[in-house]
Amino acid sequence: LIVSSPKPIRRRLGGAILILLATAGIAPAAAADLRAPSAGADWYTGAPAQTVDDSWAIAVDGSTSVTSNSSAFGSITVTAPVAGSPTQSGPRVRVEAIAGTYSYPGQAVASRVTGYQEEGSVMAGYEWVWRDAALAGFIGFNARSNQLSIVDPGNPVVGTGVGLRVAANFYANPTDRTMVSAYGSYSTKFNAYYSRVRLGYMVADGVYIGPEALFLGDDFFRQYRIGAHLSGVKFGPVQMSLAAGFVQDRVQGSGYYSSIEARANF
């Protein structure tokens, strides 16, 4: 199993992105009296920045996701500009860590198997920031470890190795009250992939609600999730996102999922 995801951003006086999903982002800079993109689109939570703020240098995103199909994952992502302001187009670096556990009925061993996954990645990329949209792309390497409670000949996703990893995130405000965000990543290690698309309508100042769809998998499992999200809820300097919905897994069958994501800028 893999949970990594994705981040978007919008601003009252403008729109932007930082990414997660990430669980990555993009962010632009502009005068406070102009309609410009915000300082750090959160591709992970979809939470929008309300004002232009160039004082922060890095964005930290955290997420946790659980399913009724016996899986639980958490991740933390740090994104920072290589030079210049994070609210302007420019090169970026991203470091991500993921850990989780899962269990499934082992067909080849006639017993329930529990798996443990740890993963870390380092990537470099570039982020383009426009008035009401942002796009970022990254490339780098990831190290991933998957261990099983018992040997399962039917599961090829086991062991530790390094792979090439690419990721991209997009965020836009098509209108003053709508948002769209997308995140995707792929690693050559176990052919792991993750993608998420969110649409949102602003129901309060900077708060969006709408549908989301996720597709994720690797050489062993394939899964999709359809649900709804509430993004942009703020608690002081922290922006939050909540989501829940239906999950369909090739190995585990159908079930439900929920996720909580947060972002803070430093």
What residues fall within each predicted segment?
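Outer-membrane pore/translocation modules
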Residues: 89-192, 213-215, 244-246, 259, ...
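Outer-membrane beta-barrel proteins and related beta-barrel translocases across Gram-negative bacteria
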Residues: 32-69, 77-83, 116, 141-142, ...
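Transmembrane beta-barrel architecture of outer-membrane proteins
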Residues: 57, 71-75, 117-121, 161-165, ...
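Short loop/turn motifs that connect adjacent beta-strands in outer-membrane beta-barrel proteins
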Residues: 45-57, 81-92, 129-136, 173-179, ...
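Cleavable N-terminal export/targeting peptides
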Residues: 1-55, 266
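Short, exposed beta-strand-loop hairpins at the edges of beta-sheets
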Residues: 247-251
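Intrinsically disordered, low-complexity segments enriched in Gly and acidic/Ser/Thr residues
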Residues: 192-227, 234
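Outer-membrane beta-barrel "beta-signal"
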Residues: 32-36, 75-76, 228-233, 253-266
